[in-house]
Amino acid sequence: MDDLSFDAATTLRPRADGSTFDLDIHPLWTVGDKPNGGFLLALLGRAAAQALGADTGGAWDVQSATVTYLAAPALEGAEIHTTLLRRGRTASHVRAVLVQSERTLVDAVLVLGALTPGTAPRYNDNAPLRIPDPDQCVR
């Protein structure tokens, strides 16, 4: 694992079934000695998108996620199991579970859809919030 990029750290190795992925939890993406929760969610999101894309032949992006962090995984190999819960024309639901030593550690349900190519997320258009001077704030 010499490549320190996020893309390299979130690389998944799909199994023949197309719904299970092997991975290594990169030690760079940690808080102390535990993997960062956002990093783990990114792994689950990539697995869900890859499983759905392999199943439908399309490109899918995570739109929302509900995640339960049951325990922190060790910095070693793990696997992600995905299950298609609902397939739609514009949005699909996938469950992704991170497992290590046959123990479920992170469980997520993700909603995926296709983003319009070349469009920026809507939050980029928002003006910065006006924050009052500290002496005008309620204490």
Regions found by a protein language model. Name each.
Residues 1-139:
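Terminal targeting signals and extreme-terminal segments of soluble enzymes
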